[in-house]
């Protein structure tokens, strides 16, 4: 459901990306709590005396006010809320990865309040965690769920039977897991039942679960992203297999 494009006041938001516009302004992609992903023009934001200068940064909770009827709204005010620790090193790249997923997969002006809360929680977790894999996998799953493509992880979609930890399953994109009988599986998406159940419970401690869940999510996301690869995924590969 699209939201009203008229004036919005003090709406919680995060900057996803920004780029220069004309000589002194910025176009900013933001993820908002009640309006979803929108684009705003921050007029004069690059001027040394602008109150917006240095404020429109990624991963910092903001309160934004804007107006306008076009696809590109005009930012009127931004306030820093605080409370979010800065992301550094691999955590910073993970944050940019989440931002790129939101930009690429969410339609503008569609509210996703639960996903906004999940994103905020993921940023908080990234700032303190030493293991980033569970954070990324959970967010990826929630994102697909919000898009209407929730993963089936607890039962065989062909037979309806509960997943067995010792059984191997072939995961069919846009359907779900089916018990594997001959070992052949499209895109090599064969997973153990334990991996599926671990993902269902959000448990990514087992090495095989970490490996197979990464392969599964990479294929699922690529299916919805299309041919254009994610820039941040290559950066993550250079650091570690996330």
UniProtKB/Swiss-Prot annotation:
Gene Ontology CC annotations of this record: bacterial nucleoid
SUPFAM superfamilies for this protein: ArfGap/RecO-like zinc finger, Nucleic acid-binding proteins
Origin: domain of life: Bacteria
One GO BP: double-strand break repair
Keywords tagged on the record: DNA damage, DNA recombination, DNA repair
Family that this chain belongs to: Belongs to the RecO family.
Described function: Involved in DNA repair and RecF pathway recombination.
NCBIfam families: reco (TIGR00613)
Entry protein name: DNA repair protein RecO
Source organism (scientific name): Nitrosospira multiformis (strain ATCC 25196 / NCIMB 11849 / C 71)
């Amino acid at each position: 459901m699209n939201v009203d494009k008229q004036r919005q006041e003090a709406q919680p938001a995060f900057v996803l990306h920004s780029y220069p516009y004309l000589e002194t302004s910025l176009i900013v992609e933001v993820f908002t709590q009640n309006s979803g992903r929108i684009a705003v023009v921050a007029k004069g934001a690059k001027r040394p005396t602008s109150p917006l200068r240095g404020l429109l940064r990624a991963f910092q909770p903001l309160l934004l006010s804007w107006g306008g009827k076009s696809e590109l709204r005009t930012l009127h005010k931004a306030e820093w809320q605080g409370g979010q620790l800065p992301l550094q090193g691999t955590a910073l790249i993970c944050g940019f990865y989440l931002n790129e997923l939101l930009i690429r997969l969410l339609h503008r002006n569609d509210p996703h309040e639960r996903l906004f809360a999940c994103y905020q929680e993921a940023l908080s977790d990234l700032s303190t965690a030493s293991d980033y894999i569970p954070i990324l996998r959970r967010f990826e799953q929630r994102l697909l769920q919000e898009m209407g493509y929730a993963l089936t992880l607890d039962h065989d979609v062909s037979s309806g039977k509960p997943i067995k930890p010792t059984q191997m399953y072939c995961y069919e994109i846009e359907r779900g897991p089916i018990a594997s009988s001959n070992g052949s599986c499209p895109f090599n998406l064969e997973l153990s039942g334990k991996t599926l159940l671990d993902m269902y419970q959000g448990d990514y401690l087992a090495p095989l679960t970490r490996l197979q869940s990464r392969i599964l999510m990479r294929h699922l996301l690529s299916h919805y992203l299309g041919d254009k690869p994610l820039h941040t995924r290559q950066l993550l590969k250079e650091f570690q297999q996330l």
